[in-house]
């Protein structure tokens, strides 16, 4: 494999991993513990 191909595969897998982790954090079982700053703010 060429160096560019390995680099592209690494960056793509890293991006997919970060995206998957953020979706799991936002909608997973621990999402009930997250606070909403818009609801905390009073007008």
UniProtKB/Swiss-Prot annotation:
Keywords, ordered alphabetically: Chloroplast, Membrane, Plastid, Thylakoid, Transmembrane, Transmembrane helix
Q: What is its main location?
A: plastid
- Superkingdom of this protein's organism: Eukaryota
Q: Does the keyword Transit peptide apply?
A: no
Q: Where in the cell is it found?
A: Plastid, Chloroplast thylakoid membrane
In the bilayer, the protein is annotated as: Single-pass membrane protein
Q: Name one GO biological process term.
A: photosynthesis
Name the residues that span the membrane.
Answer: 7-27
Q: Which InterPro entries match?
A: PSII_PsbN (IPR003398)
Pfam families registered for this protein in UniProt: PsbN
Cellular component terms, GO, for this chain's entry?
A: chloroplast thylakoid membrane
Sequence similarity: Belongs to the PsbN family.
* Task performed by this protein: May play a role in photosystem I and II biogenesis.
Listed name of the protein: Protein PsbN
Source species: Rhodomonas salina
Q: What is the lineage of its organism?
A: Eukaryota, Cryptophyceae, Pyrenomonadales, Pyrenomonadaceae, Rhodomonas
């Amino acid at each position: 494999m060429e160096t560019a191909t390995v680099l592209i595969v690494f960056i793509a897998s890293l991006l997919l991993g970060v995206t998957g982790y953020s979706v799991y954090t936002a909608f997973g079982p621990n999402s009930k513990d997250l606070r909403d700053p818009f609801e905390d703010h009073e007008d």
